[in-house]
């Protein structure tokens, strides 16, 4: 089974501490953290012995980045979690109580500062996809954003903007295509591939498309159909916004349904068939049929775009507005809207209001449509303090205040023999 019932459980906010995916998410993040700890401890020993080389400095930056990235995943999802920053020689050494979220963020700040100081601004094409200063600084901005720390969020995001390393030259409808990989607006992108020898490998590829692909049969068995969009989301787009058709994948419910322009998707002219109950699949996980035939329907070769320059511009806009610098906020916002608008001057007019409240709503709207189905909408609602209001309006009435965090995996609590304490209201 691919766990369609599990997807519905999370979508309806009725998950429990015993759900297996909680343990998997927790365990995978900590596995990476422990690997980073080993690398950093080994480099520290070389530093003490005065034997560090240039590659050690870069490796230190990369390991620090990934440790921060994983702790950010954990603190956003679970809140207080154990903070382990040393090599684990025995499992008992990791059996420690939860650390406050503030302390976790202190470690994240420390690690990202190390990454920023250690990583280069660019790499040669031979090393496409390796971590850079821009990735570290952009992730730092995102962590400040989650804390609504406007001053540090502004400094970090505008540091990246002012460097001029990234651009929005790639049209929006090409960003998530095969040709759009590692484009000028991609700051942090996981590199995945497929080969004739390993056409369906998750070792060198990813499940990004498989998890979100069309849930159908035969040629339309493209994935599990998780992370579907709603009509509520479709209605959020302004009239004529081309990002709608680049984000929402239209489909028919059966082969007997007619193929119409409204359910046909560019650029491949396909009208998938699925019995799914959601309104739209994620078009950002939609793959080229020619590559499906060569490798597999599941799209393991597709890179995962994790931080885009448009996101950084919107972080700059949001923090500038909150700091009372509307002109700068409008400029960053307009750069994002201008790329989406393209040559069609009749759509997406420039936002000109300098009223802080109105501009705040415009920026929030832009985050929703520019970054639609890219993982962070829920966390935006949480940090803005409007999650319950928005989710209830969308029909998700099971959502309660406790759902700002996930429950700790019951398996981890059991293994700790009571050292770990469950999050409030899940006990």
PLM regions: where:
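Conserved, well-structured interaction surfaces
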Residues: 2-78, 93, 99-102, 112, ...
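Flexible, polar/acidic helix-loop-strand segments at domain edges
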Residues: 4-11, 235-309
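Long, intrinsically disordered, low-complexity segments
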Residues: 29-32, 107, 117, 176-231, ...
């Amino acid at each position: 089974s691919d766990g369609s019932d599990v997807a519905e459980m999370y979508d309806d906010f009725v998950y429990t501490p015993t759900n297996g995916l909680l343990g998997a998410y927790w365990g995978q993040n900590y596995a990476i953290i422990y690997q980073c700890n080993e690398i950093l401890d080994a480099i520290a020993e070389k530093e003490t012995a005065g034997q560090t080389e240039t590659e050690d400095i870069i490796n230190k930056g990369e390991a620090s980045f990934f440790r921060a990235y994983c702790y950010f995943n954990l603190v956003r999802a679970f809140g207080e979690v154990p903070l382990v920053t040393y090599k684990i020689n025995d499992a008992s050494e990791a059996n420690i109580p939860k650390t406050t979220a503030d302390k976790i963020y202190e470690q994240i700040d420390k690690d990202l500062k190390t990454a920023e100081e250690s990583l280069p601004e660019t790499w040669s094409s031979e090393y496409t996809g390796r971590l850079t200063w821009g990735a570290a600084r952009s992730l730092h901005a995102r962590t400040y954003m989650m804390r609504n720390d406007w001053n540090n969020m502004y400094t970090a995001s505008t540091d990246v903007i002012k460097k001029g390393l990234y651009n929005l030259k790639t049209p929006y409808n090409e960003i998530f295509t095969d040709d759009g990989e590692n484009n000028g607006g991609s700051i942090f992108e996981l590199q995945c591939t497929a080969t004739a020898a390993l056409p369906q490998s998750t070792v060198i590829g990813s499940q990004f498309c498989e998890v979100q692909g069309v849930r159908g049969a035969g040629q339309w068995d493209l994935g599990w159909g998780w992370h579907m969009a709603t009509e509520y989301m479709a209605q959020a787009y302004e009239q004529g916004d081309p990002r709608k058709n680049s984000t929402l994948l239209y489909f028919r419910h059966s082969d007997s349904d007619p193929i119409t322009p409204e359910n046909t998707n560019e650029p491949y002219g396909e009208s998938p068939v699925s019995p799914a109950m959601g309104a739209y699949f994620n078009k950002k996980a939609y793959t080229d049929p020619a590559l499906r035939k060569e490798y597999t329907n599941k799209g393991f070769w597709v890179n995962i775009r994790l931080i885009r320059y448009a996101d950084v511009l919107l972080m700059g806009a949001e923090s500038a507005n909150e700091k009372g610098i509307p002109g700068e906020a409008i400029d960053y916002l307009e750069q994002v809207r201008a790329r989406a608008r393209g040559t069609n001057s009749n759509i997406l007019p420039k936002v000109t209001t300098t009223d802080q409240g109105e501009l705040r709503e415009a920026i929030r709207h832009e985050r929703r449509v520019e970054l639609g189905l890219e993982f962070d909408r829920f966390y935006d609602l949480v940090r803005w303090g409007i999650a319950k209001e928005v989710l209830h309006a969308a029909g998700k009435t099971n959502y309660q205040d406790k759902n700002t965090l996930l429950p700790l995996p019951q398996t981890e609590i059991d293994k700790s023999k009571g050292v770990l304490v469950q999050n409030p209201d899940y006990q």
